[in-house]
Amino acid sequence: MNTGIIDLFDNHVDSIPTILPHQLATLDYLVRTIIDENRSVLLFHIMGSGKTIIALLFALIASRFKKVHILVPNINILKIFNYNMGVAMNLFNDEFIAENIFIHSTTSFYSLNYNDNVINYNGLSRYNNSIFIVDEAHNIFGNNTGELMTVIKNKNKIPFLLLSGSPITNTPNTLGHIIDLMSEETIDFGEIISRGKKVIQTLLNERGVNVLKDLLKGRISYYEMPDKDLPTIRYHGRKFLDTRVVYCHMSKLQERDYMITRRQLCYHEMFDKNMYNVSMAVLGQLNLMNNLDTLFQEQDKELYPNLKINNGVLYGEELVTLNISSKFKYFINRIQTLNGKHFIYFSNSTYGGLVIKYIMLSNGYSEYNGSQGTNPHMINGKPKTFAIVTSKMKSSLEDLLDVYNSPENDDGSQLMFLFSSNIMSESYTLKEVRHIWFMTIPDTFSQYNQILGRSIRKFSYVDISEPVNVYLLAAVYSDFNDEVTSLNDYTQDELINVLPFDIKKLLYLKFKTKETNRIYSILQEMSETYSLPPHPSIVKVLLGELVRQFFYNNSRIKYNDAKLLKMVTSVIKNKEDARNYIDDIVNGHFFVSNKVFDKSLLYKYENDIITVPFRLSYEPFVWGVNFRKEYNVVSSP
């Protein structure tokens, strides 16, 4: 990161369309390392710091020299990248070749490069003289995409830009794959990773630390956004190590079926989906079925005396008394007195989706664009609504998030409760969420942070003085009240095995976190920083941001204004060239956002430079406006 670029900005205004100083400083580093030196980079920027815009700005610059292939996890994130590409183009004040940029989902990329599940090696020549940008890079390994990336790296000898807010998912194995992909050498995992009998005993050994420092030297960019522009986080529940957890004591009914499931079905309890299910809610015989879809077709099948299922529909008094779920009993009781929007994470999409829907409906909460709840709760004269997001409803996710994030929904009057499975753990942004709930314990520390990072990020809150509430729910035995204050108290298996599943899961998470934090601190220390004049390839982009910042505070200045000239000459040292640049932006009517006039264009008026507000107007028959800095096309019948 070029800290000299950050020093050019003073009191940067973030509330307008903008490129942040750290993004420009990182862009300089990427151009020098990937384009000039042909070396791969790991962009390890913590969630919410704007990795996507950095990557797309870099793609626009790189398109002048090479083809750029951007790989994203799924079609929904591809839509986000396509939208953000438009944002990046509008902020980009230089030439680029759009035809050289290709954005693929992993599915389409697989189809493009495999024939009958075999890599089409002859077709890989299309990636010669290319650069690959991989979003959520920690997720591509252990599948065909990771295999293909390794083949392309070895065959085509091209650099990669790997984006990740959490380069370690479950164990250091992921980091080992990243090192292998970024370096010119083949990594022997047996030499750098030590393995014990348990997953939590998978560690990066001293040899691995040395390999990491040696092979990735100069290839790491670490950044974490300052939290000064974020709301405070208020964790609820009792103290649990370095966080807080809400103990939800199970009823005798739930505890009985919980223990039956644990004894009969869970040979490897920490990884068994059945324990996720019964920790959320018990459903009698449903807990004993490996194929839930089969039982969902049953007609009026009794699960408990006061709970039945009919063609996949749950009904009965138990959905209100909630002896089947200590977590939902706490949740339903708590939300009645809370204001604002809720984001609720759960991992068991099929089972959890069924439980959530009918508990919410039975307790007076209506399904968004669906069934109305019993005796519905109201807000502003409208029912309080919920939606459940799983991988099965990808097609409507974008529209749903538009409603959830709209300013009109800041109070949750359009959509108050958003339940989501793992599909929402990465890449999406949620606005004005005041309550974050964990109905199931995440598998990894990185996943936990990613879920929080969907909401708690820069620009997601208008009022940062109001805290965000986090509820990490754990189903525990009716008599369980242990204080968990130190991991050292739980080093023996016999002490851990008697704990409730959720508590074991949390301890497991914390054990892995120790190793994750150790490696992250090494990566942070390796992050490349320097102070140099800006790279020639980013000069116009940098000047564009400086001009936007200048004219936010200045509506009218003299054409030969000394402050403007000084600002431009901080980048373009030659005064004549600096004056020519000022002529170009004024005669080209550069777009700015002014604090008085809002969206404006620069004009020369007599001996002054003025900001002239504008707006797009159109006749009723116009059905499409494509507005970019290069052109303005109006399409009509």
Curated annotation (Swiss-Prot):
GO terms for cellular component: virion component. It is found in: Virion. One of its GO terms (molecular function) is ATP binding. Gene3D superfamilies: P-loop containing nucleotide triphosphate hydrolases. It is an enzyme of class 3 (hydrolase). Its EC number is 3.6.4.-. SMART domains: DEXDc, HELICc. Its main location: virion. Residues 327-507 form the Helicase C-terminal domain. Residues 32-185 form the Helicase ATP-binding domain. InterPro entries: DNA/RNA_helicase_DEAH_CS, Helicase/UvrB_N, Helicase_ATP-bd, Helicase_C-like, P-loop_NTPase. Keywords: Activator, ATP-binding, DNA-binding, Helicase, Hydrolase, Nucleotide-binding, Transcription, Transcription regulation, Virion. ATP binds at H45, I46, M47, G48, S49, G50, K51, T52. It holds the Pfam family ResIII. A motif (DEXH box) lies at residues 135-138. Belongs to the helicase family. VETF subfamily. Heterodimer of a 70 kDa and a 82 kDa subunit. Part of the early transcription complex composed of ETF, RAP94/OPG109, and the DNA-directed RNA polymerase. Acts with RNA polymerase to initiate transcription from early gene promoters. Is recruited by the RPO-associated protein of 94 kDa RAP94/OPG109 to form the early transcription complex, which also contains the core RNA polymerase. ETF heterodimer binds to early gene promoters. This is Early transcription factor 70 kDa subunit. It comes from Variola virus (isolate Human/India/Ind3/1967).
